[in-house]
């Protein structure tokens, strides 16, 4: 059942369940609870994948370890790791495990762990930070800026289209996000909605990036944080460096409407499909809060008589639940969905719900390469960058910052985990002359990860 969450009073009471975590998402993964077993292993008996690199020689083990997963399973995995080892390996993790509470839950400061994550590196990052702080009394977390940008773009495109129609909204996505026109950001979103409703050209400049969409609906530029945990007594992570990257067409590319009909005195329908429960709950909840702020701003001002009906559904960090929740939003007639959080849910939801129902999907954190390759008729966008880029960033950090020459990977057994592991491995070996000894898959929700840790640390020879 779709829930109307348009009331500020309800939003204020929602609370924040951790602002620093997330999972790719973050890259891939709302697919957590329905990941499959490897071909030759069931339950916790995981085996290395056939796509892994050289197993290396002997039992000396790798210099570094890449772990790709989500916070809930990460707790047990890292407990097992620290109980089995002296913690001497350099460990690199992506955004999916960026949860400041993890060291306390694991019972170890995790000082040997470094992370990478898409950063809030947009031109209007500070304006968003202030809005989030004012609304919820806490600092924003990972992928919250991307969530705000997704919802804001959906509202602006709808205002420009003048109707709650997926195809009409799709045609306006690049027109309102890519150059040129009136520059709009979180700080003047209300004025931007009014301009879009009046048929004016606008250029949304986001909190997470410039939000220029390329021909695939991916961000044309992105920034990445290199970050560390602050220890067992903290609930935070610290970004120690931020690096910016641009694609071949930093101003964006792809089909776009030449003009927008606009329209006044109407209701914009917005769907929000993110995880309130399941493996990504701790990071999904702040993302939901961020996605609600654009609607709050518009409803308080009613520019050109525009109001926003924001409706939320919980993916439960599960592909089947995410598809069912998406169907609920489709039945409610939403033309645009901010979601989902992970590629494990985003891919099936897009294929089974958004694309056939001609609904625009714009994920704030689904980063798997498979999203780019969807046959989507241009209905699927995202404000988070592809793991094509994050895999390169991770390989560079592992080689140049952490100084590792031999590495094993441990990855959650879904599109996000497998594709990011393979992308990292390819770049690490081809561009940085490293050796990937083995790539080992693991399932979400296991009671022990000792066997997969042993396999990774022995280079797959155990």
Please identify what each model-predicted range represents.
Residues 2-22, 26-462:
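Extracytosolic ligand-binding ectodomains
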């Amino acid at each position: 059942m779709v829930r109307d969450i348009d009331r500020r009073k309800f939003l204020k009471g929602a609370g924040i369940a951790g602002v620093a975590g997330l999972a790719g998402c973050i890259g891939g993964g709302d697919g957590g609870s329905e990941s499959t077993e490897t071909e030759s292993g069931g339950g916790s008996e995981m085996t290395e994948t056939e796509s892994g690199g050289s197993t290396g020689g002997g039992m000396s083990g790798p210099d570094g370890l890449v772990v790709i997963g989500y916070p809930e399973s990460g707790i047990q995995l890292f407990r097992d790791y620290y109980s089995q080892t002296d913690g001497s390996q350099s460990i690199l993790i992506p955004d999916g495990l960026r949860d400041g509470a993890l060291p306390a839950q694991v019972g170890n400061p995790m000082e040997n762990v470094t992370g990478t994550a898409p950063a809030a590196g947009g031109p209007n990052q500070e304006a968003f930070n202030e809005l989030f702080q004012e609304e919820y009394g806490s600092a924003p977390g990972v992928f919250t800026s991307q969530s705000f940008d997704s919802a804001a773009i959906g509202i602006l495109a709808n205002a420009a289209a003048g109707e709650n129609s997926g195809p009409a909204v799709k045609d306006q996505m690049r027109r309102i996000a890519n150059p040129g026109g009136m520059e709009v950001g979180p700080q003047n979103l209300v004025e931007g909605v009014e301009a879009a409703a009046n048929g004016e050209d606008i250029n949304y400049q986001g909190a997470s990036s410039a939000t220029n969409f390329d021909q695939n609906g991916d961000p044309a530029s992105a920034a990445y944080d290199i970050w560390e945990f602050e220890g067992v007594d903290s609930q935070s992570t610290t970004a120690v460096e931020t690096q910016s990257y641009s694609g071949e067409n930093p101003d964006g590319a792809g089909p776009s409407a030449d003009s927008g009909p606009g329209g006044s005195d109407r209701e914009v329908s917005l769907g929000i499909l993110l995880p309130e429960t399941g493996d990504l709950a701790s990071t999904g909840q702040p993302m939901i809060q961020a996605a609600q702020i654009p609607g709050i701003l518009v409803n308080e001002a009613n520019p050109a008589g525009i109001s926003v009906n924001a409706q939320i559904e919980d993916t439960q960090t599960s592909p089947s639940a995410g598809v069912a929740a998406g169907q609920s939003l489709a039945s409610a007639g939403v033309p645009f969905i901010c979601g989902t959080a992970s590629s494990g849910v985003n891919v099936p939801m897009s294929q089974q719900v958004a694309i056939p129902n001609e609904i625009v999907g714009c994920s704030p954190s689904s980063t798997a390469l498979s999203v780019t390759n969807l046959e989507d008729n241009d209905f699927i966008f995202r404000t988070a960058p592809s793991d094509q880029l994050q895999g390169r960033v991770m390989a560079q950090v592992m080689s140049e910052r952490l100084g590792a020459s031999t590495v094993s990977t441990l990855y959650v057994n879904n599109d996000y985990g497998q594709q990011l592991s393979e992308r990292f491995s390819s770049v690490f070996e081809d561009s940085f002359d490293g050796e990937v000894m083995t790539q080992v898959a693991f399932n979400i929700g296991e009671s022990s990860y000792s066997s997969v840790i042993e396999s990774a640390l022995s280079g797959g020879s155990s």
